């Protein structure tokens, strides 16, 4: 019985799972919008939201803590410079998960994960 066991395994080893979410969080911070499967998106929220909370208070200790969890200098820099100030007054709920239908190959439920309050750039429509 797996009572009180939180988190999904995704049929991966713990190291593979940790690396996968580390890379997904770094990609989310860099691009502010990623597409993944719905279960991975829900689990990514448990990794990314505490990192954004850490990014709200800039300091050497917090930067080192974030780097230990992300292992990506560019993502950590953006986390503290841009995202930390953007969400300084928001008490949580930094991510939005939008369902995006089902994948063609295996019918897996897909979702977009985006940072709320991200600047939306209007794309020019070719006539």
Swiss-Prot record:
What molecular functions are annotated in GO for this chain?
A: structural constituent of ribosome
Which keywords does this chain's UniProt record carry? Ribonucleoprotein, Ribosomal protein
Q: Which residues form the signal peptide?
A: none
* Keyword Ribonucleoprotein attached: yes
Gene3D superfamilies assigned to the protein according to its UniProt record, in alphabetical order? Ribosomal protein L17
Q: Could you confirm whether the keyword Ribosomal protein appears in this record?
A: yes
What does UniProt give as GO cellular component? cytosolic large ribosomal subunit
Cross-referenced SUPFAM superfamilies: Prokaryotic ribosomal protein L17
Q: What quaternary structure, including any partners, is listed in this protein's UniProt entry?
A: Part of the 50S ribosomal subunit. Contacts protein L32.
HAMAP family listed in its UniProt record: Ribosomal_bL17 (MF_01368)
The family line of this record is: Belongs to the bacterial ribosomal protein bL17 family.
PANTHER family reported for this sequence: LARGE RIBOSOMAL SUBUNIT PROTEIN BL17M, RIBOSOMAL PROTEIN L17
Descriptive protein name: Large ribosomal subunit protein bL17
According to its UniProt entry, this protein's organism is Xanthomonas oryzae pv. oryzae (strain KACC10331 / KXO85)
**Organism classification, top ranks?**
Bacteria, Pseudomonadati, Pseudomonadota, Gammaproteobacteria, Lysobacterales
């Amino acid at each position: 019985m797996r009572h009180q066991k939180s988190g999904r395994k995704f049929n991966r080893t713990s190291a593979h799972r940790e690396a996968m979410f580390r890379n997904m969080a770094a990609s989310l911070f860099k691009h502010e919008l990623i597409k993944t499967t719905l279960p991975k998106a829900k689990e990514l929220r448990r990794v990314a939201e505490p990192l954004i909370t850490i990014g709200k208070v800039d300091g050497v200790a917090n930067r080192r803590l974030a780097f230990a969890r992300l292992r990506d200098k560019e993502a950590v820099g953006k986390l503290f410079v841009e995202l930390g100030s953007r969400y300084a007054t928001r008490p949580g709920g930094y991510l939005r998960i939008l369902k995006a239908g089902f994948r063609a190959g295996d019918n897996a439920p897909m979702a977009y994960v985006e940072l709320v309050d991200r600047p939306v750039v209007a794309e020019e429509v070719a006539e």
